[in-house]
């Protein structure tokens, strides 16, 4: 259930990943509100996710978009279309595997992972989500994977080698 909306400011695109009705039980009865998960990106390597809660859906969406804009991170892409290397990550019970792909492969991913790649600007990637299909856990696992991803420049400086030795014949 992803709904795409292109924002005018900074050309950010946002995808609504999930909308849930949640309940707080008080002594006076049940109080209903909405929890919304949104992914925001510029389709050029910057992406963020946010959660918003409010009694009204529209207000919850505004809160989620603002939270996503504040949490944006930069992901360095290979040739502007795929990841630099394969990655595994886990968040709570959500476990994911992200693999690089050749040009023309497309986005082979399901559920919430696909929405992250679409707003990030990745065109070729293979992703698998195991153990959990909870959108929040899966998206947090993707962001954890992005945090652990290293660019060829970072790998070369860690190993004390040249970038050409690391990249090879890609």
UniProtKB/Swiss-Prot annotation:
Keywords: Ribonucleoprotein, Ribosomal protein, RNA-binding, rRNA-binding
One GO MF term: rRNA binding
Cysteines paired by S-S bonds: none
Protein's GO biological process: translation
Cross-referenced PROSITE patterns: RIBOSOMAL_S5, S5_DSRBD
SUPFAM superfamilies xrefs: dsRNA-binding domain-like, Ribosomal protein S5 domain 2-like
GO cellular component: a single term: small ribosomal subunit
Domain S5 DRBM: 12-75
Entry superkingdom: Bacteria
Entry-linked InterPro entries: Ribosomal_Su5_D2-typ_SF, Ribosomal_uS5, Ribosomal_uS5_bac-type, Ribosomal_uS5_C, Ribosomal_uS5_N, Ribosomal_uS5_N_CS, Ribsml_uS5_D2-typ_fold_subgr
Subunit structure: Part of the 30S ribosomal subunit. Contacts proteins S4 and S8.
Protein family according to the UniProt entry: Belongs to the universal ribosomal protein uS5 family.
Note on domains (UniProt): The N-terminal domain interacts with the head of the 30S subunit; the C-terminal domain interacts with the body and contacts protein S4. The interaction surface between S4 and S5 is involved in control of translational fidelity.
Function of the molecule: With S4 and S12 plays an important role in translational accuracy.
Protein name: Small ribosomal subunit protein uS5
